[in-house]
Swiss-Prot record:
It is found in: Cytoplasm. Coiled coil: none annotated. HAMAP family: HisH. GO terms for cellular component: cytoplasm. This is Imidazole glycerol phosphate synthase subunit HisH. IGPS catalyzes the conversion of PRFAR and glutamine to IGP, AICAR and glutamate. The HisH subunit catalyzes the hydrolysis of glutamine to glutamate and ammonia as part of the synthesis of IGP and AICAR. The resulting ammonia molecule is channeled to the active site of HisF. The keyword Amino-acid biosynthesis applies. One of its GO terms (biological process) is L-histidine biosynthetic process. InterPro entries: Class_I_gatase-like, GATASE, Imidazole-glycPsynth_HisH. The lineage of its organism: Bacteria, Pseudomonadati, Pseudomonadota, Gammaproteobacteria, Thiotrichales.
């Protein structure tokens, strides 16, 4: 009998966890168990990690620090298949401009910047709704997802990684911005795959089948 695969969805009070967990469960096979947890031991024992998030960077970092899971989270982000979603992408960076400046997890070197929509009166903030992701690299998490597929976004800030080689996807809202990154065992996306219909479901399937390489 094959050992069951455990995927932990990290609960730190800042994500639509149920929607993410339900989408992952829908994508999972019978040998995969999805659990929601705020415990460091469940992060360490998991075979893969999903790190969702929504809200403001300062509140997210405060919540992470209060749950005492930061060390386990950083360790997992370098060791096992790891999927960051929305704010779960942004707080992986070094620093965010949000809330007058917030130090983030510094797992990935880079900054989080606010959209500048000057010259684009037709565009709104936040960037909300469906938009295309242009895949900039060939990656297992893009498997069976068509180029320029539409995903659902809700955000006012975007990541700017120092190493442009880790950019996995780009989207245009006034300007072209990084909407997905990939580095070793880690993949993170600005959009909400749990709200992104078939493309989002396929992304979850790809992640659950991914060995992190």
């Amino acid at each position: 009998m094959t050992d069951q695969k455990l995927v932990t969805v990290i609960d730190y009070g800042m994500g639509n966890l149920r929607s993410v967990a339900k989408a992952a469960e829908h994508a999972a096979d019978s040998n995969t168990r999805i659990c929601i947890s705020d415990k460091a031991e469940d992060i360490r024992s998991a075979d893969a990690i999903i790190f969702p998030g929504q809200g403001a960077a300062k509140a997210c970092m405060k919540a992470l620090n209060e749950t005492n899971i930061t060390h386990a989270l950083i360790q997992a982000a370098t060791e096992k298949p790891f999927l960051g979603i929305c704010m779960g992408l942004q707080v992986l960076m070094t620093h965010s401009q949000e809330n007058e400046g917030v130090d983030c997890l510094d797992i990935l070197k880079g900054d989080v910047q606010k959209f500048d929509l000057s010259g684009h009166p037709e565009l709104k903030m936040p960037h909300m709704g469906w938009n295309q992701i242009h895949q900039t690299i060939d990656h297992p998490l893009w498997h069976n997802i068509e180029q320029n597929s539409r995903f659902y976004f809700v955000h006012s800030y975007f990541v700017s990684p120092h190493d442009k080689q880790i950019i996995a996807g780009e989207t245009t809202h006034g300007k072209r911005f990084t909407s997905a990154i990939a580095q070793n065992n880690l993949f993170a996306i600005q959009a909400h795959p749990e709200k992104s219909a078939d493309a989002g479901l396929q992304l979850f399937k790809n992640f659950l089948n991914w060995n992190g390489q």
